[in-house]
């Protein structure tokens, strides 16, 4: 009896081991299929050991982590880029083909178009044209002021823009003439030709000014034609200061000053007598590319104009503005 039991036990042991191996093999096959590892078709044997499978699985996890990190970084760059001053500069047709929602929040509305496929010169024939869609986009503002360091004289300093992306002049129109000797002449007549801008100097002082080219008459070679323009007062004559004084309305003197002429003393004269007179600025434009087939012209400009005077109470600062411009010329 004991011998028969021992024989049966000896007979059953390989069967249990075989079933355990079969179960382990099937489980391994399922894991491999789940992670894309193919098993051998003959005999149910695996082409790779379990250790190799786990190593490959770990590598896949690392690769997936890297891809997730890259996707997150890319999303962050895209999100930050949406709040910047715009990405790639578009052509006029590309801008017109976009919807409001496609332009909103991208900075494109504050950019002047560019020209593709043109020539690097002014290639228009002599004649009379009308400049339309004239656009000026500043890319740099500098203000002449005393330096921060000791014993440093006044010089143009780079500034930080405090205004939203609404400083571009656009839809400006006017006659544009090309003479037989190659010179050009442009007169500004209409359009969005001014924009209120505020910049901040490195020391913290904020400088408001009215970026404009009102009544501009510029002439010269296409490589460099310049002219003067009118700079209106930053504030109108009906603007009232905190004490109710204005140019065409409000009090003549500060409130509560005693009579007897003390309100017109020299130190208070500029504050009491508001000055809304306009000043002058100058601008130089250069053509960098043109496309006669479409009538498009692009270039760069540099403008020099005074800042706000607070209705005559402050000495204006010189503001230098650099940027790009775009226009469409239609022959008359």
From Swiss-Prot:
Any one Gene Ontology cellular component term annotated for this protein: chloroplast photosystem II
PANTHER family: OXYGEN-EVOLVING ENHANCER PROTEIN 1-2, CHLOROPLASTIC (PTHR34058)
Single Gene Ontology BP annotation: photosynthesis, light reaction
Protein's recorded name: Oxygen-evolving enhancer protein 1, chloroplastic
One GO MF term attached to the UniProt entry: oxygen evolving activity
Assigned keywords, A-Z: Chloroplast, Manganese, Membrane, Photosynthesis, Photosystem II, Plastid, Thylakoid, Transit peptide
Key word Cell membrane present: no
Organism: Spinacia oleracea
Entry keyword annotation includes Chloroplast: yes
Pfam family, one: MSP
Similarity comment: Belongs to the PsbO family.
InterPro entries per UniProt: OMP/PagP_b-brl, PsbO
Source domain of life: Eukaryota
Function noted in UniProt: Stabilizes the manganese cluster which is the primary site of water splitting. Binds GTP after preillumination of photosystem II core complex. This binding is inhibited by DCMU.
Compartments, as annotated in UniProt: Plastid, Chloroplast thylakoid membrane
